[in-house]
Amino acid sequence: IIVILVIIGIIFGINQIIKSKNDNVQKLAKVYEDLKSSQSYCFQMERNNNNKIIMAQKGDKTIIDQYTKEEEANTQNHTTTLIKDNNTYLILHDRKEYYVYEENNVDQTILINGIKDIINKEFTRGNEKVRGKRYDYEEYSGSSMFMISNTLNIDENEVKTRFYFDKNDNLAYIKTIYGDDNELLKISLTKDVDDAMFEIPSDYAEN
């Protein structure tokens, strides 16, 4: 019986050490390392059905897809910045037209480098209920990168960003907090990227 109790005690102690080690892991840093080592990813930030941003990369091709609609507006705006073949394309979907900027590459590492800058800042940990479920979060100060709303008049030093993770450490939500206001984005991150995302529709005209 004593031997069994000792074994149980050892197992419990090992589990506590592992749990403590996992609790101290910087989860956003793991997201960064995963993105940096991947050849493709699709990162979607959604405030609601009418306002979202999709950033995708596959090899040397990148898109930034933006959907916006103001509350008083009747239509949704959809624009895409596409970088491929050493050119940048600005696609205006409502007009079915696009502009070509030859040999003018937009920074294709904006997402990865943005997260890299954030993980080097001080952060705190917590747990909070979001839309009915509880999530662990890491809160960082000094970045408005993940705000879809207008950020022109915002003092970044006053901004806090919470990254919420599910039980499998997948990024689930991002909340940007500024004073009494906040913006919550639902996050989807996958490595499955369809090549069709990087194609301009055949019925669009070059301007």
Residue ranges, per PLM feature:
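Flexible, processing/modification-adjacent segments and terminal tails
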Residues: 19-27, 34, 83-155, 196-200
